[in-house]
Amino acid sequence: MKKLTLLMPVIFAISSLIAQEKQGTAASSAQEIADKLSNPVANLISLPLQSNVDYGIGAHNGARYTLNVQPVIPVHLSPNWNLIARVVLPVIDQRDVTGEGNHEFGLSDATVTGFFAPSNSRNGFMWGFGPAFLVPTGTNDFLTTKKWGIGPSALVIKQVSGLTFGFLVNQLWSFAGDENRSDVNQMFLQPFFAKNFKSGAGLGVNAEITSNWIAHTTLATLNPIVTAVTRIGGQTISMAVGPRIPLSGPDELRAKLGLRGVLIFVFPK
């Protein structure tokens, strides 16, 4: 609870920055916004709220709800370069995952990534690179590594005629934290594909692959989604929904089935 209280000023600061950026900006077309949301290094402020529900986890058929708060804030460095700051802060509520009758709720560890990316694409190609950080914000012993981590992150994408495809990858190693906890040596890989239409509707699919090099395990999930961009009042939003299909992973970590819903508050320039 103490860590959650400390994070509230950060959340309010992000909200204030977004509100200031929103003022005086012109509306963009629905497809243009959808294409930018498909691009992890687009020059676009957004606040995605990603909800995941996973069922049938482990020996006790546990269930987990994860809300990923994922603010994206671009910073203009020069006429040729931007820095795209991306945060993933998970809030988790799970039952019967760590043991029958067990219940855990709270923050999990945050991942903070900074992508240095060219301001303009070349023939539809864009790329980005930068550091990724693991921050032990977890408020429950079962939801945190209690480790600080750092490593490289990179992505490559191609966009043309409403199509977006590419991949994002990062590797994290722990360098400090609780000595009684296992070290972190983990890679995350996310290939993705999206097709957006003039109406702002779209279809997409990505795979989320997490490899733990110390435990020699790989957890992979396929996420097909249907998306839409619309406006409610003066606020531009994007919505997405789809199943989460487990592909591989150890029995104690892999779910049998899941669902994903995403609500993104968009602040076009």
Which residue stretches match the model-derived regions?
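Transmembrane beta-barrel domains of Gram-negative outer membranes and organellar outer membranes
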Residues: 21-269
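Cleavable N-terminal export/targeting peptides
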Residues: 1-30, 269
